[in-house]
Design a protein with these regions (language model features):
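Short alpha-helical Gxxx[C/S/T] motif in the catalytic ATP-binding
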Residues: 125, 130, 134
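Glycine-rich ATP-binding loops of the HATPase_c
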Residues: 142-148
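Glycine-rich G1-box
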Residues: 19, 99-100
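Conserved micro-motifs of the catalytic ATP-binding
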Residues: 37-44
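Short helix-loop "hinge" at the ATP-lid/N-box region of the Bergerat-fold HATPase_c
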Residues: 60-61
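A conserved beta-strand-to-alpha-helix junction within the catalytic ATP-binding
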Residues: 2-15, 27, 50
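Short conserved segment of the HATPase_c
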Residues: 101-113
């Protein structure tokens, strides 16, 4: 785990979807609720956390019709109801106005090999392990990920919450950037991500 500016991390990652956004004429935006700050330092595993967002965003683009909207938002929060590591957290929300998910199957999407079954997926099959991988990686970050349908019935809302700070991490999990060089960009990260569900 390394201390990273999550704002820059998300911006770099979103650029990899610019072509898809243009091709489907999808409005793709990033909103920050950081009380005027332009950056937010968090501790993440730079070799794996990109897979979490790439999997969720890939599904958002897959199931959002042409001319639709996909929004990524970032904020921080505090909740005493959470276990100690998550009392102070940062949250990444990914919201689309796509086809949504059957409310009776919404929890199943994180199960290994589960695939959504609808008209849009008949010619667009995936492996069924993308979101399962995302949940596993989020849990390794001591966080939570959940999905819900939007209250207006127009699409899906994914919520990813991870702890702020590094007190929840073991000493051997912390990486010193001075020992490994400068902070890598998304283009330098491993390309073995699994993007589909």
């Amino acid at each position: 785990f390394r201390e990273t500016d999550i704002v820059g991390f998300i911006n770099d990652l979103m650029q990899t979807f610019n072509y898809q956004a243009q091709k489907k004429n999808i409005t793709f935006t990033f909103e920050k609720e950081l009380e005027g700050a332009d950056s937010l330092k968090v501790w993440i595993d730079l070799n794996n956390f990109d897979k979490v967002l790439m999997n969720v965003l890939s599904n958002a683009f897959k199931y959002t019709h042409e001319g639709g909207n996909i929004e990524v938002s970032l904020k921080t929060g505090h909740n005493d109801a959470y276990r100690s590591a998550l009392k102070d957290y940062f949250e990444i929300d990914i919201t689309d106005n796509g086809i949504g998910i059957d409310k009776n199957k919404i929890e199943q999407i994180f199960e290994r090999f589960y695939q959504i079954d609808n008209d849009m997926t008949q010619s667009n099959f995936g492996t069924g392990i993308g979101l399962h991988l995302s949940r596993s990686l989020v849990e390794l970050h001591h966080g939570i990920i959940k999905a819900e349908n939007r209250k207006d019935g127009q699409g899906t809302h994914f919520i990813i919450r991870l702890p702020l700070g590094s007190n929840h991490l073991k000493a051997e999990e912390l990486e010193n950037p001075e020992e490994t060089g400068s902070e890598p960009t998304i283009s330098q990260l491993p390309k073995d991500s699994i993007y589909e569900t």
